[in-house]
Amino acid sequence: MTTFLQRDDFAVTARVLGALFYYSPESHETAPLVQALLNDDWQAQWPLDAEALAPVAAMFKTHSEELLPQAWQRLFIGPYALPSPPWGSVWLDRESVLFGDSTLALRQWMRENGIQFEMQQNEPEDHFGSLLLLAAWLAENDRHHECEQLLAWHLFPWSSRFLDVFIDHAGHPFYQALGQLARLTLAQWQAQLIIPVAVKPLFR
């Protein structure tokens, strides 16, 4: 069994990242997390090298004229085209559509493993943030084999490309830093996985 999934810091970091990508920065789920990242205390508790985290921490605190809720709206809601859509099927489906074949494959996998996960609204389950929240839930419930499968089959095949584009087009220092923190953290997880990451073609 992959030991990193059994550590408390895996579930905590997955839940923190998942919430920050999934919920508005003003929501009760994320407002305390936003404030924590604007301070320096979080770095000592994040399971990455302090030297790697230092520039990320500095970027979190960089001022921007655009308000954080406005940036979140622009990046995750619209009304204009999202610069880096957070749903897996947009990257994995040839037509770049929501509810694509990869979403259906995720749903089938969830059914086969008896996993029920409530979404905020009628949206695809393959949202980057919701997949991280699901990974945290699986780890917290000692379902480490399913957590590995979720990461290797349904998240890692597209998450690196999503994060690269997200960072390049974030347009706000907080979300640019969040993308970099996610990229560093997920790279560490992937390096420690036992099962191989599925190789899938990307269409964006």
What are these regions (language model features)?
Residues M1-R204:
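Charged, alpha-helix-forming regions
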